[in-house]
């Protein structure tokens, strides 16, 4: 398993991490993702560690905290072999301060995460969403306090706008606070919006991308394709209408291209879609999920090989989409935006 530096930091992370959204199934939303218990989680974690996947991503809202509890139980005796990333910011209760990136919420949220995980520190704490109501200075001063207290090692954001990430980095630089070294983002062959604004920012500022839902909300498994809708009662059918809007014909073009590459390489469609991401600049880590060992091993098979230039070009062309303004305008003046 290759390791990459996470942004400008000295922290090295495996190119794949394991997402725990399938742990617990503690409410209707997460039951649809999975309901892995502590025993099943322990087996999946052992498989991950055997294959070099030594980073585990979770969040306080996953199954109302149950995912963190199960992860904590499953890693007992293994803590020194792995990295934990978790996320806070979204609603965890009905109180007026049970959400957001305020000092009040962050300190309480981190303490509760540590209790559920049964650990003394979090390797990477990410703000799960952009809080435009709390002053960035307050948020970063609090994160600085948590780092100095030894409760958190590194910080990052998730689902931020470009302006908010840049403002956060500027405030950190001004006051000497820890910088966001990671940005957990939605990115796949089906959803390439990250490339327009956030990728150039990440490259310029040294922010490593951690990719969530790398199979496009489950659309890039090969189970949904032209003339072959997912069978009723299957997970592929259940998620067919979920997630961000997408153009169906574009999805089918991408699947057709993946089929061509699969025939050439002998790799599965998910493996190819994941491998394409691993080759993208600024991507430090791709978060995979699995509800059973076979699915996990198949996803890990995305590593250890590379797409050819021709195969990569085929996938790039099939998945291309017109960018939003001002990116389409900037592309009309390539002499002003030459690659470094």
What are these language model-derived features?
Residues 1-82, 148:
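N-terminal binding-site loop/beta-alpha segment at the start of enzyme catalytic domains
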Residues 2, 42, 204, 228-260, ...:
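Terminal-tail/helix-coil boundary detector
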Residues 6, 18, 41, 56, ...:
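Conserved, mostly hydrophobic/aromatic
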Residues 11-16, 51-55, 78-82, 119-123, ...:
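Short, well-ordered coil/turn segments that N-cap beta-strands
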Residues 21-23, 59-61, 87-91, 127-130, ...:
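Active-site beta-loop-alpha junctions enriched in small/polar residues
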Residues 27, 93-197:
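Glycine/proline-rich, positively charged
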Residues 45, 68, 72, 110-114, ...:
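Generic structural signal for well-ordered alpha-helices
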Residues 194-234, 268:
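Aromatic-lined glycan-binding groove of carbohydrate-active enzymes
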